[in-house]
Amino acid sequence: MGISVHCDIVSAEQEIFSGLVEMVIAAGSEGDLGITPGHTPLLTALNPGPVRIIKQGGEEEVFFVTGGFLEVQPNMVTILSDSAQRAGDMDEAAALEAKKEAEKALANRGGDFEYSRAASQLAEAAARLRTIQQMRNKLKR
């Protein structure tokens, strides 16, 4: 059993994960982060995307967060997100449809067009698809 740190992944609706992990990998606002026990305390914004955790014993689990914050304390990693879900529970068809709708909104700018909202929706849909792809790659191993 390797050295571990406690990790909580919490959405506005519920706690998604709570347990000991050897590593947390997440998409921070300044790039990807790899958090291991003993990491320097940190508070950063998260981009929409996958959060991978390596549990004790090497088992990996993947989650999707729509953004939020990651906080690292000496013995604790906390991820707070508006919305989070296990990657295995994601619907690829819905993610593809959301991506198409966002691309269509960007292409057909109307009078009350909100570019930032459409771009944000496109980024989130693309991140959902990346998370699904990571999950597939994990299952192939």
From Swiss-Prot:
Protein's gene: atpC
UniProt xrefs under NCBIfam families: ATP_synt_epsi, PRK00571.1-4, PRK13442.1
One Pfam family named in its UniProt record: ATP-synt_DE
PANTHER family (alphabetical): ATP SYNTHASE DELTA/EPSILON CHAIN, ATP SYNTHASE EPSILON CHAIN, CHLOROPLASTIC
CDD domains: F1-ATPase_delta
Main subcellular localisation: membrane
Keywords of the record: ATP synthesis, Cell inner membrane, Cell membrane, CF(1), Hydrogen ion transport, Ion transport, Membrane, Transport
Compartments, record wording: Cell inner membrane
Family, as annotated: Belongs to the ATPase epsilon chain family.
Any one Gene Ontology molecular-function term assigned to this protein's record: ATP binding
Membrane topology (UniProt): Peripheral membrane protein
UniProt name for this protein: ATP synthase epsilon chain
